[in-house]
Swiss-Prot record:
Transmembrane segments: none annotated. Interacts with cypE. This is Protein snwA. Belongs to the SNW family.
Length: 685
């Protein structure tokens, strides 16, 4: 049969502790062997406590260490158990405590004995001790009934005893406080009385002289200690001994750091985003480095680009819509303007047609009357016919020239009418050119007006255009009527002259009328421009130049250089101050006269507004003047004796007669005085 050692592998290392082997321990001495034998004998002779077996431990209370034997606590016994004094707290130092010292256990426990009072009640308050007053009974809650003996005042001895006891207790507390506040080096030593010792030396030298001479009494006194003396002994701090050397760290030799490594390990200084107490100018890159801005990559969301693109598309669409709307409005305005021009042109054409029809009828009547006298005197009839030719416009003139050859077939008449036709055509061409220039000027003025109006706000444009068109239409109609009247008058005057003079006067008249028309248009445009400017200033809340300069103060005018102050030497200096050889005392005036200035300060219209007291207004009015004053009526409306008379008299009064006596009043009669009305009946009769 193989052993266990043969089955196990052979150990690599064998450790042997020779000190624990009993063969290598030193042999004890005989005396020690005897003591050990005696202790072993006592332990063997000591009776061992028998612990009941499991199931038979009813009523068993383990309290000491030996009650547990070699084991632990008994779980079936429901009391507090401390095997081997494990978990026991506190060691009693009082003399009346029960001390258990068994099997080398040095723990002490304080057990309070159970005590009862006179009635047999257990005194549970004994557990708390006797340090203070305890109220554990019902009688402690009831007010105590003091007897007459207890309520008596204490005598002087008791008062003094209580006073001394209280004083000593307070002094003890105060002295303890003072000692704790003193220096630790100072130690108060209690003063002890001197000690007397009788000293007798021993007879070691063998002298047999009188012993009384050798004995002496020694007085022992403590040496006085200086309270301010520094400590004699220096407390040296214990130096820590070096422990075992640190374990060596096996690592490769240090290598030289590169620039990149140094930059990676650089810790930037902290820069606050809220405070800069020293006012340093810190660049933005330093702030980003301190905040760690370069450590993280900035990621921009794609929605920013989408949002920007959407805004751009929306803006382009809005611009296109606005431009289309503006183009549509411009076209509508152009159409409206063309429509108004067509309407005005048609109105002018209708007026011309109407005037030409009236002139044609008048001309035919005159031609019929002239044809009767044509056989008598051809030359005179031609002159009269030229004089009687009424002023006509272009259409009537062209129609008349067409009808003239049909009436007269003579060659002279043809030549005369041909000359007249040429003159009329030339005048018509001049008038057409003038009309074209006038229309071009008016169109330019309208274009300039439209360009100015386009710069105004869109809200006021419609109203302003309508107002301008209405004003222009009225002015144009007025000018056309004036021109037609002037043309008719001048043509009637010019037709009376000779043919050669009429052609020259026609050119001069056209030139003069054109010049006057241009001047009128210029004045009209200037007035219109001034009105528009004032309108814009009023709409914007600004004042016009006239109102602004009129409302300025004199100080503002002086500051702006607009005040035209005319200064003269007479107004600045007094003339009496010049050409005098002495001071003011010679020739300036008397002391009682008030002629300091050469002329009054205010003159003209300003002097009329200055208050001047009347010369006769002195405080010398008499009682008669006050009584004669008309207080209730007009001046001079007083009665006889200077008594004032009011404007409106009371009813039932008559001031035609003067009063000679005092005022007599009639007593008002009551109905009780005449109950039957006899007085009224007598008055009626």
């Amino acid at each position: 049969m193989t052993s266990l050692s043969s089955l196990l592998p052979k150990p690599k290392n064998v450790y042997s502790n020779e000190e624990e082997d009993p063969l290598f321990q030193p042999k004890p001495k005989p005396q020690q062997q005897k003591q050990q034998q005696q202790q072993q004998q006592e332990l063997n002779d000591k009776p061992k406590k028998v612990i009941p077996t499991y199931g038979n431990r009813k009523g068993y209370l383990p309290k000491n260490i030996e009650d547990f034997g070699d084991g632990g606590a008994f779980p079936e016994i429901h009391i507090v158990q401390y095997p081997l004094d494990m978990g026991r707290k506190g060691k009693s130092k009082s003399s009346n405590s029960n001390t258990s010292n068994m099997n080398g256990g040095g723990t002490t426990t304080s057990i309070v004995p159970v005590s009862v009072d006179s009635t047999g009640r257990v005194k549970h308050e004994a557990i708390l001790g006797e340090k203070g007053s305890l109220h554990s009974q019902y009688k402690d809650l009831i007010p105590k009934q003091h007897t007459e003996h207890e309520l008596q005042r204490p005598d002087d001895d008791e008062l003094q005893e209580t006073l001394d006891r209280t004083k000593n207790a307070l002094e003890k507390i105060v002295n303890g406080k003072i000692k704790s506040s003193k220096s630790t080096n100072y130690v108060e030593v209690e003063k002890k009385s001197a000690t007397y010792i009788k000293y007798t030396p021993s007879n070691q030298l063998g002298s047999n002289n009188g012993s009384a001479l050798n004995s002496k009494i020694v007085r022992m006194v403590d040496v006085a200690q200086d309270p301010l003396e520094p400590p004699k002994y220096k407390i040296k701090k214990k130096i820590m001994e070096h422990g075992s050397p640190p374990a060596p760290v096996m690592h490769s030799p240090t290598r030289k750091l590169s620039v990149q490594d140094q930059q990676d390990w650089t810790i930037p200084p902290c820069v606050s985003n809220w405070k800069n107490p020293k006012g340093f100018a810190i660049s933005i890159d330093k702030r980003l480095v301190s905040n760690g801005g370069g450590l993280q990559d900035v990621e921009i969301n794609d929605k920013f680009a989408h949002f920007t693109q959407a805004l751009y598309i929306a803006e382009s669409n809005a611009r296109e819509e606005v431009s289309a709307r503006a183009e549509l409005e411009r076209k509508l305005a152009q159409k409206e303007k063309e429509r108004k021009q067509d309407m005005l042109r048609k109105l002018a054409e209708d007026v011309r047609n109407e005037r030409s029809g009236i002139i044609q009828q008048r001309y035919t009547r005159k031609d019929n009357s002239d044809s009767d006298n044509d056989n008598d005197n051809d030359s005179s009839s031609d002159e009269d016919k030229n004089k009687r030719t009424p002023p006509m416009n272009r259409r009537s003139r062209s129609r008349s020239t067409e009808r003239i050859p049909s009436r007269n077939d003579n060659d002279d008449d043809d030549d005369r009418y041909r000359i007249k036709d040429n003159r009329d055509n030339r005048g018509r061409d001049n008038i057409d050119s003038r009309d074209n220039r006038d229309s071009r000027d008016s169109r330019d003025s309208r274009d300039s007006r439209d360009s100015r109006d386009s710069r105004d706000s869109r809200d006021n444009r419609d109203s302003r255009d309508s107002r301008d068109n209405r004003d222009n239409r009225d002015n144009r109609r007025r000018d056309d009527s004036n021109d037609r009247d002037r043309y008719s008058k001048r043509r009637s005057d010019s037709d009376s002259d000779s043919d050669s003079d009429s052609s020259d006067s026609e050119d001069e008249r056209v030139r003069r009328e054109r010049k006057e028309k241009l001047e009128r248009d210029k004045i009209r445009m200037e007035k219109k421009r001034e009105l528009e400017r004032e309108y814009r200033l009023e709409a914007s809340g600004k004042k016009s130049k006239f109102n602004r300069d009129q409302d300025r103060d004199i100080s503002e005018k002086i500051a702006l250089g607009q005040a035209s102050i005319k200064r003269t030497e007479d107004s600045i200096y007094d003339q009496r101050l010049f050409n005098q050889s002495e001071s003011l005392t010679s020739g300036f005036g008397n002391d009682d006269s008030y002629n300091v200035y050469s002329k009054p300060l205010f003159g003209g219209a300003v002097s009329n507004s200055i208050y001047r007291p009347k010369s006769n207004q002195e405080d010398n009015t008499s009682i008669q003047d006050v009584l004669s004053n008309s207080r209730f009526g007009k001046e001079g409306g007083s009665g006889s004796g200077g008594v004032p008379r009011p404007n409106k008299e009371f009813s039932g009064t008559d001031r035609s007669k003067d009063r000679t006596g005092p005022v007599a009043f009639e007593k008002e009669k009551k109905k009780s005085d005449d109950p039957f009305g006899f007085d009224d009946f007598s008055k009626k009769r």
